[in-house]
Amino acid sequence: MNPQQRTILLVDDDHEIVESMRTILENKGYRILVARDGNSGLMVAERENPDLLILDMMMPKKSGFLVLEKLRSRPGGMIPTIMITGNEGSRHRAYAEMLGVRDYIRKPFAMEKLVRAIDKVLGVKPRGEAGFDDEG
C-alpha cells in the first residue's frame, strides 16, 4: 500500500512531538491531520475518517481513552489506533488493548519505532522488501 493514499490523524497536546511526527510522516508521503486535544481529535476523526489514529493517552478536555470509547461506539466502527503515552502502567496498556489499540508506544520514543508501527498497522512494506513497488 502506498503511503500517499493514507491519512493519519495525530492527536496530542505536546506541540514538539506533534511537529516531529508531522514532519517525518509527511516526508514519507502520508496526509497528516492534527488535533491538540481529545474533543478536537474526536471531531476530526468523525469528520475525516482517517486510515490511522495516533492518540496520546493523557490530554486536556478528553483523554485518549474517552476518545477511543466514543469512536468504538460509532456506526463506522473503530479506526486503527496507535496510542502513545508517558504512562508506564500495565492497567492502562491492558485497557488500551481491550479498546482495540493496535500498538502502545511509551514516550519518549524513537521516531523510527513509530514509523515501523505505522507501516505495520497500515500494511506498508519498507523499501527494499520483496513486493515493494519502487518507482524511480
Tell where the protein language model's regions lie, with residue ranges.
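Active-site beta3 strand of CheY-like receiver
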Residues: 48-54
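The short loop immediately C-terminal to the conserved phospho-acceptor aspartate in CheY-like receiver
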Residues: 14, 57-58
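Charged docking surfaces used in two-component/phosphorelay signaling
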Residues: 19-27
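C-terminal output helix
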Residues: 109-118
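Acidic catalytic/metal-coordinating carboxylates
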Residues: 37-40, 63-67
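The feature encodes the CheY-like receiver
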Residues: 18, 60-61, 74, 89
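Alpha4 helix (beta4-alpha4-beta5 surface) of REC/receiver domains from two-component response regulators
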Residues: 66, 88-103, 116
